[in-house]
Amino acid sequence: MTAQRETVVLVHGLYVHGLWMYLLECWLEQSGYRTVNFSYPSMTRTPGQNAADLQALLEHQDTPVVHFLAHSMGGLVVRHLFHDHPKQRPGRVVTLGTPHQGSYAARIMH
């Protein structure tokens, strides 16, 4: 039986596409992780709506450990995920430049 690799879910930020995380995805895979690059419509749906889509994606992943690496608004999507769907597999969450205290862009969008 082959040991399953830990999974890192990459969640991009506002105004960009999942391809923006491609170099990180390649580096993580070369480092032995399995990756899932979650691309979502950051301008037309709320972080909560995108978190629901992320949860649906996670339900189809066969992996024992899930880590999250999120940039900017992607970190808010992950926060909504854990708030709305608290039962998650073990793993770590890393957010980069996430406006946890709010931002001007968030105020004018919603």
Please annotate each region the language model reported.
Residues 2-7:
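Proline/glycine-enriched tight loop/beta-turn segments at coil->beta junctions
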Residues 8-19, 23, 27-110:
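Serine-dependent carboxylesterase/thioesterase catalytic core
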